[in-house]
């Protein structure tokens, strides 16, 4: 199969935080068009591929992306014209060679990823296939269990909570549609509880609430209360997941972690997590240690990795080399997958494949700076990942992904699978 790319064009648009980002359109010879917008993170891992920003303080506080846009229009486009849009791997390799750096700092990961995603969309549209079927083939059928970020802290909020995300996980639901309902009803119950306690119920970047509470544990207790208030059973219908983002409160000089008002050593932090795991139905903990603290991950995984999903985000940055190291060290049993951490569709699929073949789960993830683009919803189903993290139950850029998953579930009909607890295949529950 062969279809030529006849046009590649990029423009500067805005993300959900009002910051510029890159949108790319790719046109094929049959008139098919693929469009994609690149997301952007707030708490970024130091090993992520480079997001190119202009640095011109007179425009968008230095966050403009005209250089990345120019790189697409002037440097990338001429190289792709006439190439076969159906050969995603070849096209992504052309992009990587054109950039030639380890972290995509020449062209920018935001330029490369925008093109990579848009090519995939254009090819799918040309074949009149849904994106998940194009990327995943006939066996793409698993709807993901959502990890819904309803209380925000850390770098995502201006409050006193250290842990970045407190999530509800409706793994006990029979279908994705019902899981979404469980989540939405719990979200509304949570809002009512916070309001009655006198907390502000404005939402943060990812659509969750950002109350000032006594400590991190109180946030978990409030979630349990909300789950019960919505008529569900914690630990049966709905579980809890945490994204600690520990690199954000790690002190490199002392080697300690500042959490809940005091400094903790690695061993003290592990005991803190273990006490939470024993008290509450916590099914997943992301980035519990600094992104270079491999030993802490190894120790923690050895102690609790059989019953709790330990997710590496900043640890791996969707990078096959770092993931391979984690596999060899047995550092975690799960990886967070973010397209823009690595910067191309092919490399993302490679990371997912490597994790799967080593019995690690994949959690497909959004970024805090998102857009209306729903690529990750299709990616989750395409790869049968079984898990997705795409924010709370408010803000259209988050809901867009959930609504796309509803459409996919409907389209798949009886073939659709929602695996619930079985999606957490790297642990025993």
Curated annotation (Swiss-Prot):
Q: Where in the cell is it found?
A: Cytoplasm; Secreted; Cell surface
Q: Which cofactor does it need?
A: Mg(2+)
InterPro entries, alphabetically?
A: Enolase (IPR000941), Enolase-like_C_sf (IPR036849), Enolase-like_N (IPR029017), Enolase_C (IPR020810), Enolase_CS (IPR020809), Enolase_N (IPR020811)
Pathway-wise, it operates in:
Carbohydrate degradation; glycolysis; pyruvate from D-glyceraldehyde 3-phosphate: step 4/5
Which residues of the sequence carry a binding annotation for Mg(2+)? 243, 286, 313
Q: CDD domains under this entry?
A: enolase
Q: Which organism is it from?
A: Thermosipho africanus (strain TCF52B)
What name does this protein carry?
Enolase
């Amino acid at each position: 199969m062969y279809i030529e790319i006849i046009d590649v064009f990029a423009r500067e648009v805005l993300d959900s935080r009002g910051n510029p980002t890159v949108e790319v359109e790719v046109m094929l010879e049959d008139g098919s068009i693929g469009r994609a917008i690149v997301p952007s993170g707030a708490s970024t891992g130091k090993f992520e591929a480079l997001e190119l920003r202009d640095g011109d303080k007179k425009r968008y506080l230095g966050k403009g992306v005209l250089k990345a846009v120019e790189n697409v229009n002037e440097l990338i486009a001429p190289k792709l014209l006439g190439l076969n849009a159906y050969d995603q791997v070849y096209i992504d390799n052309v992009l990587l060679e054109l950039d030639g750096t380890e972290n995509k700092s020449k062209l920018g990961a935001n330029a490369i990823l925008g093109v990579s995603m848009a090519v995939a969309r254009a090819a799918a549209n040309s074949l009149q296939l849904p994106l998940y079927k194009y990327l995943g083939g006939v066996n793409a059928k698993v709807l993901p269990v959502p990890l819904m970020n309803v209380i925000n802290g850390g770098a995502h909020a201006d409050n006193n909570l250290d842990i970045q995300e407190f999530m509800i996980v409706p793994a006990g639901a029979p279908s994705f549609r019902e899981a979404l309902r469980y989540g939405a009803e719990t979200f509304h119950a949570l809002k009512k509880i916070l309001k009655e306690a006198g907390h502000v119920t404005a939402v943060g970047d990812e659509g969750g609430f950002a109350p000032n509470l006594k400590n991190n544990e109180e946030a978990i207790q409030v979630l349990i209360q909300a789950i019960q208030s919505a008529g569900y059973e914690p630990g049966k219908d709905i579980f809890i997941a945490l994204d600690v983002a520990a690199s954000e409160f790690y002190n490199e000089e002392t080697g300690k972690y500042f959490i809940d008002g005091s400094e903790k050593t690695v061993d003290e932090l592990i005991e803190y997590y273990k006490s939470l795991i024993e008290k509450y139905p916590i099914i997943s903990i992301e980035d519990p240690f600094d992104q270079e603290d491999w030993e802490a991950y190894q120790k923690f995984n050895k102690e609790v990795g059989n019953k709790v999903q330990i997710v590496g985000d900043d640890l791996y940055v969707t990078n096959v080399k770092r993931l391979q190291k984690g596999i060899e060290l047995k550092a975690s049993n799960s990886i967070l997958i973010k397209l823009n951490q690595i910067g191309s569709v092919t490399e993302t699929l490679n990371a997912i494949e490597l994790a799967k073949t080593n019995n690690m789960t994949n959690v497909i993830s959004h970024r805090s700076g998102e857009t209306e683009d729903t690529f990750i919803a299709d990616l989750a189903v395409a790869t049968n990942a079984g898990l997705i993290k795409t924010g709370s139950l408010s803000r259209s850029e988050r809901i867009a992904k959930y609504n796309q998953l509803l459409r996919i579930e409907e389209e798949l009909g009886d073939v659709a699978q929602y695996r619930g607890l079985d999606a957490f295949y790297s642990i025993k529950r």
